[in-house]
Amino acid sequence: MIIAQISDTHLDPEDPKVSSRILDLERCVADINRLDPLPDVVIHTGDIAHNGTPIKYKEALRILGRLRCPLYISAGNRDDRGEIRRHFPQERYLLPDTQFIQYPIECFDVRLIALDTLSETTNMGNFCKVRADSLRRTLAEDCNKPTAIFMHHPPFEIKDSKFPLQFDNQEAITMLSNALEGQCHVIRAFCGHSHRDVTGNISSVPASCVPSVAIDVRLGVFPQSFKTKPVYQIHKYNSHQGFLTETRAAS
């Protein structure tokens, strides 16, 4: 199974100062479409738009609609749940009667579960009892199939960040960690938000962040050849090694 992960596109077609972000995403989508073999799935781990107004999601849909493989999304702190549902109505995984954007994807070699880490009050992450109970129920439905979760906020400390803790408080991280405790079939967590390539753990699950597609807000050290290119990650799964990750610069 091959997963392409993109994140933190921060589209804002109303602000000419950040028009480059549109080109960054277009280049990224074109590069994914040229891959051979194509990924089985693309996951966008949030901050699709720089703030959740309709025109920004319309632009996102225009570009992301060009993908030649299925797209699944988790919401970032800059996103709006209602606008995501309105602009991606054809995707039945975004059910209108759910409070949070959390759902399983069952049709691949690895089961994927999107988690909603939006806080109602800050740009940091949150995870409440409702979301934790939903995750536990979803995990219990299939304890045998390898499973990966994807979410916006990384639930581990990033020491070189201005805000090492990416959640509102440690209690929210503990809520998530407890829900994953003993879930041996959960083999990976994919995150965004930090705008950099960084790894950690949540409970006993290896976790990683993908750099932002938007070059102007990307953080971290990269080869010189990456400087002017949007970056995304390819996660390749096999049953012997689990996930192997490649950070790729779009041409």
Roles of regions detected by a PLM:
Residues 11, 50, 119, 155, ...:
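Short, glycine/acidic-enriched loop or turn micro-motifs at the edges of active sites
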Residues 1-59, 158:
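N-terminal active-site segment of His-dependent metallophosphoesterases
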Residues 5-7, 40-47, 71-77, 116, ...:
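Active-site neighborhood of phospho(di)ester-bond hydrolases with catalytic His/Asp-centered motifs
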